[in-house]
């Protein structure tokens, strides 16, 4: 029940923000906005101001904006109607919907980086059979402190450094065990796996998994958080348009790459259990994707 309500709330936020973008651009362009509704269906209540009816409706599944003369059947040629505007103004009205979604995503990412987010540490939780780490003697509870001489403090550092050195057959790995630093040579297993866009990527694997029960909270200053928030927004945007290009060009299956409403609901249900920061991150990802 809670997951359903959260899912409806998220969809509502995304749609309302999108429609509010159209609303702002229409007002700035001199187009008469006949109605701005939060929700669909029967009206619960409404007020009218400056020729615009503001309504709250019964079905909380987003909302909509009704512009004067936004279809040819109703178009009368009045100067404040949608189709009376030059094409650049009409484009601006359409464009501002997704722009405001991007702004929402950026703001949420910015807040997350400011408030703090959990990062998995460098502690090993599991060592897998058949990989170099097991053969070299790494055990659960060890901390990976360095790879190829580069200091690593989080699991993300470990993954990134391994991939930077994935062409090497062996890696020099520093570990902390019972207060003592040890240096091990670990064979790297070469493999390839599909990335987020379904493209094959060469990977190097040590055969270790993190201890998911140990995390640290990472926070950044306001300006640094703004930079990281902007960067994450741009990165997700690039990934989204790359995926669209791959789908159009036939390099990526639409079925395998597009998550439908059921998939979104399942992900939302899982994210809801992880707390407000994870939920904000999910909303931001949806907003810019």
Model-identified regions with their sequence ranges:
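Envelope-exposed proteins and targeting segments
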Residues: 52, 120-123, 140, 169-171, ...
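Small-residue-rich helix-interface/hinge motifs
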Residues: 2-76, 288
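Alpha-helical transmembrane signal-anchor/signal-peptide segments
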Residues: 29-34, 116-134, 139
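Conserved PDZ fold ligand-binding element
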Residues: 133-155, 233
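PDZ-domain C-terminal substructure recognizer with occasional recognition of PDZ-binding tails
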Residues: 139, 145-146, 161-201
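Internal alpha-helical transmembrane segments
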Residues: 59-129
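Functional transmembrane alpha-helices
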Residues: 81, 85, 128, 193-289
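Generic alpha-helical transmembrane segments of integral inner-membrane proteins
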Residues: 4-8, 12-16, 20, 95, ...
